[in-house]
Regions:
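Alpha/beta-hydrolase-fold serine-hydrolase catalytic core, especially in secreted/extracellular enzymes
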Residues: 23-110, 120-123, 300-491, 499-524, ...
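Catalytic-domain carbohydrate-binding cleft regions of carbohydrate-active enzymes
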Residues: 234-260, 266-274, 278, 282-325, ...
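Cap/lid segment of the alpha/beta-hydrolase catalytic domain
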Residues: 121-215, 222-223, 262-273, 487-570, ...
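Primarily recognizes the serine-hydrolase "nucleophile elbow" in alpha/beta-hydrolase
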Residues: 209, 216-281, 562-632
Length: 692
């Protein structure tokens, strides 16, 4: 009798019906070495087509989460006391200026200058953050093309408080081991922070620290008695423009913002402080800036830099989002005929915008910049001799303190009851998705069965699965036992072999070994190709991970796609759903643990990995920025609870305490099995057959 499944291997369905193709009985061609073109900071980007308010609000939520995860700020650190010091007041015509320093994180000091209105009463006044660009002098730059002091003085004279603060490594914001850095070396030391590859495992980065500095700078302004907390704003140029729209993406306290000469569909930022891991795998600066909508925003562009297309590309794209939110009047974009700048012409455009939204001035009001005199550097410097407070941490000790913060956050998430598991999932599922750069639930565009055939009573097919447009196909081999569709509770085992010394058979061959044993127990089997087997570009070069997935992220993404396909079947009688077991052999067991939430149950060969070893997690096949912030391989495993899990070959250094605690806390200890040794194939088959 003909296998009823053969006619149904118009097989796996999720989104689009599988296409059968009458092809020769041969295996699909090997995957190409590169899955897709490598992106970098200059790769042109397109704004996605957004059709509705709801679609944008959902995407904006994803963007905010991605920014926070990439910056190592998910979950948010505790906001410890700032212990702000404001001193050295100088009074001038219509304004005062003071020196400021405070602690965004304990024993790390952020410094700047606070400009306040004089002769306008006690307030409360609007308050504006002023991050600076990569001028040689940082916040103390005062040239024709850009002057932080010029805009801060004029903001104060117009009735607004202004706070200018340093990038890390500039002027007064540094680490004691940097010494008294000369002006010429500011940028060099700025790019020195957290460049050790190990820091990527924690998403500790220059961009993350500066984003947190901006959040805490906003806290500082909000703490001042003469500040109106409902009228907070931010503006900066170039790298300071990046800080502006990054803050706007994650902080709803901003009432207005003005990123200057930075939002572009081409160049996304050329410094480490603008390129956190994973930030632009899916998103561009255009979308990150648009995440502030519907709050008032003005983009300033120049004909002489990468923002030259703002009138035809970036501006209209973001304007469409404001239109979807019925907030067209809250967005404006202008371009001036200059090079890269924040000059007087650009500043006056921002004065008008902030005057409208922060001071409620009429549209016709056009405040002009008044003549100003910047104070001498020595009178604005907070630590002019480079000597920081005695308790300031060195860079290495500060980085270790941030790692300890993440460790404490992970420990605080330990699951102790069912409510704790739910809380863990709500917090950590976004972290899991954005750390691994996966779409969840996985989407499948097309799945084709090629060369469907009968082999010794089993139905076999080579599968070609397309996840998303532009991706290379995922290739797999499939076998089904007789009567699979008449089984009231059919099971399929997805096998991924991470070893190169024992390839599993393809669909043109008679199944043997583990696949045959599974088939003889009435289980369908899908064996996945090893994905991208070529040598990728150096994943550790600056910015690579900002724009591209690592090999590990690609593999986990593919496993989730395959599991989504394997769980849904085409049957003439209607859709059928298979119970999916994901089985990872060798290093693929670790990939399977990260993909565990996409499967009904998981068997993972843990390869006796020493998870505590940074060197082990920096191996090309296991490297994933931020992986330690999701508990490495335990995080994805806990997210799948209470589904059955079998971890074997754990050895002595693979942590499972948090995982065991979670299963025990919800009364599901019987669903979890952890074995130090590697199990034999027959033991794996028995576990799959018995698990419910």
């Amino acid at each position: 009798m003909k296998n009823p499944f053969a006619s149904a291997v118009g097989l796996f369905l999720l989104v689009v019906c599988l296409e059968q193709a009458a092809l020769p009985a041969e295996s699909p061609a090997a995957l190409p070495e590169q899955r897709r073109a490598i992106k970098d900071l200059n790769t042109p980007r397109e704004f996605p087509k957004i059709a509705s308010r709801e679609a944008w609000e959902a995407r904006a939520k994803e963007i905010r989460e991605q920014v926070l995860v990439s910056c190592g700020l998910w979950p948010m650190p505790e906001k410890t006391p700032l212990q702000a010091h404001v001193f050295g007041r100088i009074e001038r015509d219509g304004y005062s200026v003071e020196k400021v320093y405070f602690q965004p994180l304990p024993r790390f000091y952020l410094a700047g200058n606070l400009y306040r209105p004089l002769g306008r009463g006690k307030g409360p006044f609007p308050a504006i953050l002023n991050p600076h660009g990569h001028w040689k002098e940082g916040r103390l730059a005062d040239t024709k093309d850009g002057s932080t002091a010029a805009r801060c003085i004029n903001f104060a004279r117009q009735g607004m408080i202004a706070f200018s603060y340093d990038m890390v490594g500039y002027n007064d914001t540094s680490f004691p081991d940097y010494g008294n850095v000369p002006i010429e070396a500011y940028y060099l030391w700025h790019r020195h922070f957290a460049t050790n590859q190990v820091n990527l495992l924690w998403n500790i980065s220059l961009m993350g620290l500066q984003t947190w500095d901006s959040v805490r700078a906003l806290d500082f302004l909000a703490s001042l008695p003469d500040v109106d907390r409902k009228r907070l704003a931010c503006t900066g140029e170039s790298g300071g423009g990046t800080q502006t729209f990054m803050l706007g993406a994650v902080e709803d306290r901003l009432a207005a913002q003005a990123p200057v000469v930075m939002v572009s569909h081409t160049m996304q930022g050329g410094c480490l402080c603008e390129n956190a891991p994973g930030l632009r795998v899916e998103y561009s600066n255009m979308e990150i800036a648009a995440a502030a909508a519907p709050r008032p925003q003005i983009l300033l562009a120049a004909t002489g830099d990468w923002t030259k297309d703002t009138l035809t590309v970036e501006g209209p794209a973001i304007e469409h989002i404001y239109q979807l939110l019925d907030a067209q009047d809250r967005f404006r974009y202008v371009r001036f005929n200059f090079g890269h700048n924040y000059n007087q012409t650009s500043r006056e455009a921002v004065y008008r915008w902030f005057g409208k939204w922060l001071l409620k001035q009429p549209d016709a009001a056009s405040p002009k910049e008044e003549p100003y005199q910047k104070e001498p550097d020595a009178d604005l410097r907070v630590f002019p001799d480079g000597k920081l407070p005695d308790d300031a941490l060195t860079e290495a000790r500060f980085v270790e303190s941030v790692k300890n913060l993440h460790r404490a956050q992970w420990e605080s998430l330990r699951v102790r009851d069912e409510a704790g598991l739910e809380g863990f999932k709500q917090l950590m599922q976004p972290a899991w998705r954005h750390t691994l750069h996966i779409e969840w639930p996985a989407r499948v565009a097309r799945c084709r069965a090629e060369g469907v055939r009968e082999i010794e009573g089993f139905t076999a097919a080579a599968l070609r699965i397309d996840a998303l447009e532009g991706d290379a196909s995922i290739l797999a081999s499939y076998w089904a036992p007789p009567g699979i569709l008449t089984n009231p509770a059919p099971k399929v085992v997805v096998i991924c072999n991470g070893r190169s010394d024992g390839p599993l058979p393809d669909a043109a061959a008679r199944p043997a070994g583990l696949p045959l044993a599974l088939l003889q127990h009435g289980l369908a089997v899908l064996v996945v190709d090893r994905f991208s087997t070529g040598v990728p570009p150096n994943q550790f070069t600056n910015f690579y991970t900002t724009y591209n997935r690592t090999k590990l992220q690609e593999r986990v993404r593919d496993l989730l796609t395959v599991c989504a396909v394997a769980g849904s079947v085409a049957d003439p009688r209607g859709p059928r759903f298979f119970d999916v077991t994901l089985l990872g052999i060798g290093p693929a067991g670790l990939w399977a643990l990260l993909a565990a939430p996409g499967s009904g149950s998981v068997i993972a060969d843990c390869d006796q990995l020493d998870v505590a070893s940074d060197e082990a997690l920096l191996a090309p096949d296991l490297f994933c920025p931020g992986i330690r912030n999701i508990g490495a391989f335990e995080g994805g495993s806990i997210l799948t609870a209470p589904h059955p899990l079998l971890l074997h070959n754990t050895g002595a250094a693979f942590p499972t305490d948090a995982l065991r605690s979670a299963y025990r806390a919800i009364g599901a200890s019987n669903k979890l099995r952890v074995v130090a040794a590697r199990l034999r194939d027959e033991e794996l088959v028995n576990w799959i057959s018995q698990v419910k």
